[in-house]
């Protein structure tokens, strides 16, 4: 589905955050390694939703919403957020790394498209992308058996 309006993109961002939070909750329930880190990602996801919604509701108007600021294909950022029973821990963590890359790409692409029309929403997207980008490092440390 191609998203054109800010509200569509915000709603999709919310779904990415909530879906990936569920993935990390499930991952922490299945494996003993890195539980604290994974649950911290869940909390951060909830904060990300609040941050994005604040930026959106703080600047949105009918004039901005009426124009089509985006041309984002949601299928390009689709996530598989379920973990099959018996999945090897390293495979699940590698999937988490891929998921983070996809979500960061979404936020950076959306920020770039929205930049000319509004400042606060792209700034929030870039901030969330930066936080999520750091997760890749933490996940890779978990893969090597090191603590963050």
Tell what function each PLM region has.
Residues 3-6, 10, 38, 86-89, ...:
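Amphipathic alpha-helical coiled-coil segments and their boundaries
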Residues 13-24, 38-56, 100-103, 125-139:
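Alpha-helical transition-metal enzyme core signature, strongest for iron centers
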Residues 20, 26-27, 76-116:
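Acidic/histidine-rich alpha-helical segments that form the ligand environment
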Residues 26-36, 113-120, 146:
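Inter-helical turn/loop segments and adjacent helix faces that build the functional surface
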Residues 52, 56-59, 63, 111, ...:
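Leucine-rich amphipathic alpha-helices with coiled-coil/heptad-repeat character
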Residues 54-89:
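Carboxylate-rich helix-loop segments that flank metal/cofactor sites and access channels
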Residues 119, 126, 134, 141-148:
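Charge-rich amphipathic alpha-helical interaction elements
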């Amino acid at each position: 589905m191609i998203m054109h309006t800010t509200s569509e993109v915000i709603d999709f961002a919310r779904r990415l955050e909530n879906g990936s939070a569920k993935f990390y909750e499930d991952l922490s329930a299945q494996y003993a390694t890195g539980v604290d880190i994974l649950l911290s990602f869940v909390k951060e996801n909830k904060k990300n939703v609040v941050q994005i919604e604040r930026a959106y509701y703080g600047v949105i108007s009918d004039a901005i919403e009426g124009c089509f600021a985006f041309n984002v294909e949601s299928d390009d950022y689709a996530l598989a957020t379920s973990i099959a029973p018996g999945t090897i821990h390293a495979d699940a963590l590698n999937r988490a790394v891929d998921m983070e890359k996809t979500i960061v790409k979404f936020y950076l692409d959306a920020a770039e498209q929205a930049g000319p029309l509004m400042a606060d929403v792209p700034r929030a997207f870039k901030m969330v992308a930066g936080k999520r980008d750091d997760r890749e490092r933490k996940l890779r440390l978990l893969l090597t058996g090191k603590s963050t």
